[in-house]
């Protein structure tokens, strides 16, 4: 029974269906034995008959002709538009013109272009193709350079990314002669730089009607051509063609185009894919997205050269440069050579031989951080300086502990100049890591941070000889991570240097500069540099552990002589000879080291210098204290005669007389920032000061003793007493402020009234403000004081305050104290509104014209500091000549006032004056 399905499988085979006796075989004796199975066999035969190729299937209905015509137009214009976009971006095409001479625009796919005449015959193939019957072939557009127009003395060259020139024709012909099977050798004069390919890939018959999806196909084609237009302007050939047209360059550098029907006949000899600049993969391919059409897919591909830096050079110059070896190995990248068994002895790059121990790469200690945050495989508690002594750069000229770096391999120090690659380099070990090209750089900081990337150290082989004619190249691979950020950030004086000669020795120790030679005998003229070696002295460990370096080692500037290993640690320079290195060293020596950064001749460290400076300032403190005590004693001595009678019991003092500080001005808030100009009495001028006090106070003291017991003269006595020491106007201290009180009686008396209030608030007067340094009284002052005493003895006590203050006010001491308690300005600051003296009126008007509304500063407040930012009467204070004129004229004006006052009573004069003063207090409170 298992043979039952095998019979129908044999019948349904294609070979069996072609035989004419199929029905007789289905009714054989085997089917009779099966019983009910003959129907199944007949069903299988009847089922396979329609599928037989001998029988015609019913024809599929053809799509509408209108849909086919629209699809043909889309495909035809797709090829034409793609060709126009590519050709117009690479060459100067000639637009096609109509009968009237106008251009023929093409607005298909929403990109307006012009019909061109250059490739009209070639494009006819795709303009007459169809989607179903006359299917289009692939269209290939090549952009190339024609070198046949070059002269015999000219060569088409390409400059690679490293600056080396390559002869393009020589490279192409060398590949062509080796791969050409024919015996005839022909010279190639074309360089293909770009190839475009557009192809319709069929997928079979379509459905009955595809007309409804054609608008969608057209919209997708719009997006495709926008992408194509942008891509043609981004490829290297577009830039090369644009520059050639703008510069009117050589005809061999003008791109040309051609259209082909297929790929080149010989695929092994593809001129586009042949390398011409030494790179293994010279071309790049870009595939656009396929455009789905009802009959298949429209695909577009572009293959272009990645480098199009072509130019025309002289053949003789190119040949000469090749003989000189200038273009050989110019910045040739060094690739990793995986030969772990290579143990060739490595020497530090340079012209000096190596005679040092070879440290093992695996034993190099990793350390990073700064002097304050040092991390490394060192015992806990080790200071950064101590760790630096043990963690030395392999290859430095200072000895290291034998247990820190075993001697097996040599590792070059960090390079500070461009590195030249030697002509003969052994294979490097496999454990090397990729490194970067060192550059000329100077670290601006004393130590690197944790964020600084470690600079790898370089493993160099035999040093290149000075007679090498190779161009400097990228240095070989170096060990990644061995250069710590701490070593990278430190100045050159803390890092290792070039190898020393066999006769040179150096000691490892504290960061004390050592006068060790940094170069061999060829450079003995170079003076010694600061290094991280030398004998230890007292104070060095303290300096290193605190994170501070010496002045000479912490500042490393170019040309200062501290970067001693710049020339010694470079592998190879651009001109690899000893003369250039010697010139560079001389250039470093030509710049003089700054005196503050240079090494000390006596070897004194920065710590000792700092201690010496601090000691000098410490010694100055004693003289400063002695001067302060002298100032304090002079203040107390001058105030001893008048301090007992200056206190007003009604207003408590802000500062007691006994609390005079030696560091602040007496009579001011004890603040070190209080601005004042101290008038320090000198021993040379003590006699003159005594003369001033004797001449300037004799009159006022006589007046005080004569009327000391009268109750009506309490205010006058206080004013006369305070006039010798108090401030006339509580302004910022000035050198010439005291002249206002020594000029005239009017100004002096007004200042006496002011000083009474000021002194009652501060309880004493500062000697630094010129309290006793008064000018000798003039004859006019003595005459005015004599007249004042005579008038005081003849008038009633109620009128005695008017000529003294020159304001016409008759306030009593009780009213004065009341005004002080309300923080009103003193009477001497603002003259009365109806002053009896016309000159005093002039002074008030000048102040009012300067500023109508007085500023609210601290000058009128007796609870704050006397320092103020804004003063309303700066002009009146600075007008010193006007004050002197008023002082000289006040006695005559006062005599005229007294003559007019002798015939009238004092009552009418008292009321207006007092009223004017009270209104002024109301409007100028707190000033």
UniProtKB/Swiss-Prot annotation:
Ranges annotated as biased composition (Basic and acidic residues): 793-803, 891-901
Cited Gene3D superfamilies: 6.10.140.1900, HORMA domain
Function summary: Activates the ATG1 kinase in a nutritional condition dependent manner through the TOR pathway, leading to autophagy. Involved in ATG9 and ATG23 cycling through the pre-autophagosomal structure. Also involved in cytoplasm to vacuole transport (Cvt) and more specifically in Cvt vesicle formation. Seems to play a role in the switching machinery regulating the conversion between the Cvt pathway and autophagy. Finally, ATG13 is also required for glycogen storage during stationary phase. Autophagy is required for proper vegetative growth, asexual/sexual reproduction, and full virulence.
Protein name: Autophagy-related protein 13
Localisation per UniProt entry: Cytoplasm; Preautophagosomal structure
Keywords for the protein's UniProt record, in alphabetical order: Autophagy, Cytoplasm, Protein transport, Transport
Biological-process GO terms, alphabetical: mitophagy; piecemeal microautophagy of the nucleus; protein localization to phagophore assembly site; protein transport
Effect of inactivating the gene: Does not significantly decrease the growth rate under nutrient-rich conditions. Strongly reduces conidiation. Causes only mild infection in point-inoculated spikelets of flowering wheat heads and impairs the spreading to nearby spikelets. Also reduces strongly the production of deoxynivalenol (DON), an important virulence determinant.
Family (UniProt): Belongs to the ATG13 family. Fungi subfamily.
GO CC terms: Atg1/ULK1 kinase complex; cytosol; phagophore assembly site
Region of interest (Disordered), ranges: 1-66, 334-359, 388-559, 628-716, 786-927
Subunit (UniProt): Hypophosphorylated form interacts with ATG1 to form the ATG1-ATG13 kinase complex. The ATG1-ATG13 complex interacts with the ATG17-ATG29-ATG31 complex through direct interaction with ATG17.
Organism phylogeny: Eukaryota, Fungi, Dikarya, Ascomycota, Pezizomycotina
Domain of life: Eukaryota
Biased composition (Polar residues): 14-30, 393-402, 513-523, 544-557, 684-716, 850-868
Feature: compositional bias, Low complexity: 630-671
Organism: Gibberella zeae (strain ATCC MYA-4620 / CBS 123657 / FGSC 9075 / NRRL 31084 / PH-1) (Wheat head blight fungus)
Cited Pfam families: ATG13
